[in-house]
Amino acid sequence: VAYLILNKDLPNTIELRKFEKEEKNNRELSKNLYEIIKHMPKKSHPMDVARTAVSVMGLEDKETQDSSPEANMRKALRIFAKTPTALAAFYRIRKGKKIIKPKKNLTFAENFFYMCFGKVPQKEIVKAFDVSLILYAEHSFNVSTFTARTITSSLSDIHGAITGAIASLKGPLHGGANEEVMHMMNKIKKPENALKWINNALKNKEVVMGFGHRVYKSGDSRVPTMRQYFGKVAKLKKDKKFEKIYDIVEKVMIKEKNIHP
């Protein structure tokens, strides 16, 4: 999928292997960036860490002054490869644990889990994460895409464009909405509280995050796929608490407001 987005076409076997090799060879961060991440406030939001890390990558990149299409393709791949490493490193530091360096023998999704937790989880969980990354990878002309294109329209550099896009993506009316949904789930705590909570929220005219879309009036097209994997992970973990909360809230929102997730 990453190859498709960058090259506008699917790779053959040889092209895919070359692309995967390049991605794996560029996962490691500089000593300088690791040190910067170590000194970031532990309360920092991960999206702010990603934004800052990409900006530093731009300062360090050997082709930072070259904005040719060919150089931008190479820089895009390096940003793609290094960003998970930066986020995982910050996660470990925030937890008071030693940084785990990337492994070249793991897939993109597997490697992120490994760098965060020191092990790769069950294949079903890796698959669910992979599917989520694919669904988020490209989503038409949204706010963060618009932001990146606005920045590049002045012929600014790719790292600056991605830094701006990440800042835009963080917002609760864009990519940050899923974080707000998780906060909502944690407030509800258990399925027995869900019906009362959602009814009170509607009665008090509160915003219920995760519902309603400026484009998808009958529901986000990504939801059915993620709902499927949500259920698979819940079953695997033998914990359907959040799945049950979701189903109750969704049912009430559709019935009372005709608003879909």
Residue positions per predicted region:
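Hydrophobic alpha-helical bundle cores within soluble ligand-binding/oligomerization subdomains
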Residues: V1-P261
